[in-house]
């Protein structure tokens, strides 16, 4: 009887270790009438270390797209470079992981003089800003482009140096930098952010990461709509649809890939726009391809050098394909990706 009990116990332990994991429940809190579980589902295994930029090892191969009032909720690991920049624990801008020390964002997010770096934090490694598993990093330095012009938003780029390095894994991945711009390069582009999903309703703020598809426009065509457009800017939208990034998740990345399954590259930083979600009216982004040398110079001067040449990979010119998968068909319910600003916040920053 004792031997049988020992064998039974061993079989139960072995089964627990080697058997399939219990499927995770569906996610979340009720958002606009859709009831979901307390937290977003997490990956069914611990994150594994990664070093490749633009990689989405957890997300690749998954095809589920949750729609929130016609918008789209990002899947776990779909935008592992995305971060939330917060002041006194209040989200106000977005950003992206450049490497373990550096966060890339927009200068206009940090354009003032009185909030010290130690009052800022960066949240990463999660889609849900209420998740207990999110990682929070302190900021050591705020660095703005010295030629940023508030009047026309030229050179709208900034860097945050973290107080301690990020332990990169497949939920915290640096984004790649491109070597060339142009709509002919990119097959699929997205923006993502935390914020409002209805321009008229400031209470429609989300704690879950939302995403919207984008197509990069021809610069000459866009400059006819926006006379103050400079060569340091690019335009992106989704023709005949109301997808847009708007007030608030400024500083977040516009990311593209040349082919499904390949690496992702940050081609733009959410900067400004004429309106939110109007058909055939694009948003304006900082054209990141113009700033590789600036990034290298600044990071070198700050003692945490970033060598873009070692991280960039040339992407092949590809013809534009059909609209990306998971995008609602015309006529289906949808809403804008809207993002909320934080008012009356002042920053102390270094200019380079």
Swiss-Prot record:
Q: Where is the Peptidase S1 domain?
A: 68-300
User: SMART domains annotated for this entry?
Assistant: Tryp_SPc
Q: Which UniProt keywords apply?
A: Cell membrane, Cytoplasm, Disulfide bond, Glycoprotein, GPI-anchor, Hydrolase, Lipoprotein, Membrane, Protease, Serine protease, Signal
InterPro entries recorded: Peptidase_S1_PA (IPR009003), Peptidase_S1_PA_chymotrypsin (IPR043504), Peptidase_S1A (IPR001314), Trypsin_dom (IPR001254), TRYPSIN_HIS (IPR018114), TRYPSIN_SER (IPR033116)
Domain of life of the organism encoding this protein: Eukaryota
Task: Extract the PROSITE patterns matched here.
Answer: TRYPSIN_DOM (PS50240), TRYPSIN_HIS (PS00134), TRYPSIN_SER (PS00135)
**CDD domains recorded:** Tryp_SPc
Q: By its UniProt entry, which Pfam families does this protein fall under?
A: Trypsin
Compositionally biased tracts (Low complexity): 319-330
Q: Where is the lipid attached (GPI-anchor amidated serine)?
A: 325
What EC numbers are recorded for this enzyme?
3.4.21.-
Q: Which N-terminal stretch is annotated as signal sequence?
A: 1-18
- Positions annotated as active site in the UniProt record: 108 (charge relay system), 156 (charge relay system), 250 (charge relay system)
Q: Is the keyword Glycoprotein assigned to this protein?
A: yes
Sugar attachment sites: 240
Give the residue ranges for region: Disordered: 308-330
Q: Which residues form the propeptide?
A: 326-352
| GO cellular-component term (any) | acrosomal vesicle
Any one of the GO BP annotations? flagellated sperm motility
Tissues/organs with expression: Only detected in testis. Expressed in spermatogonia, spermatocytes, spermatids, Leydig and Sertoli cells. Expressed in prostate cancer and ovarian cancer (at protein level).
- Disulfide bonds, which pairs? 93-109, 189-256, 222-235, 246-276
The molecular function terms in GO held by this entry are:
serine-type endopeptidase activity
Protein's job:
Probable serine protease, which plays a crucial role in the fertility of male mice including sperm migration and sperm-egg interaction.
Q: Return the similarity comment.
A: Belongs to the peptidase S1 family.
Q: Which PANTHER family match?
A: ACROSIN-RELATED, SUPPRESSOR OF TUMORIGENICITY 14 PROTEIN HOMOLOG-RELATED
Record-given protein name: Serine protease 55
Q: Tell me the name of the encoding gene.
A: PRSS55
